[in-house]
Curated annotation (Swiss-Prot):
May act as a double-stranded DNA (dsDNA) mimic. Probably regulates the activity of a dsDNA-binding protein. InterPro entries: dsDNA_mimic_put, Put_dsDNA_mimic_sf. This is Putative double-stranded DNA mimic protein KPN78578_21580. It comes from the Bacteria. Belongs to the putative dsDNA mimic protein family. SUPFAM superfamilies: Putative dsDNA mimic. Coiled coil: none annotated.
Length: 109
């Protein structure tokens, strides 16, 4: 895969794209009770955090997860406003290179 460092999504664009994908697919992949909980609590305790891809993605995908081009976005709820997300609804692996639309999601079970 040939990728260009100058053609990447910004961190904000990456977070926004991951969250949009999450919202689009959540109804098909989460329990209805989880969707209700997320929607009720997101305003106060919800968030999306950007990370380098964790090593356990290698169990799910078969390409090099160079952190220059791939990001992991964790979407969920924290115990407090501004706290660390500890109630995870989805982990989204996203390619930040604009010409390579790769996305993989691990949903809450």
């Amino acid at each position: 895969m040939d990728m260009d460092l100058n053609n990447r999504l910004t961190e904000d664009e990456t977070l926004e794209q991951a969250y949009d994908i999450f919202l689009e697919l959540a109804a098909d992949n989460l329990d209805p009770a989880d969707i209700i909980l997320f929607n009720l609590q997101f305003e106060e305790r919800g968030g999306a955090e950007l990370f380098d891809p964790s090593a356990d993605w290698e169990e799910h995908v078969d390409y090099d997860l160079n952190p220059d081009f791939f990001a992991e976005v964790v979407i969920g709820l924290a115990d407090t406003d501004g706290g660390e997300i500890n109630d995870i609804f989805a982990r989204v692996l996203l390619c930040r290179e604009k010409d390579h639309k790769l996305c993989h999601i691990l949903w809450r079970e």
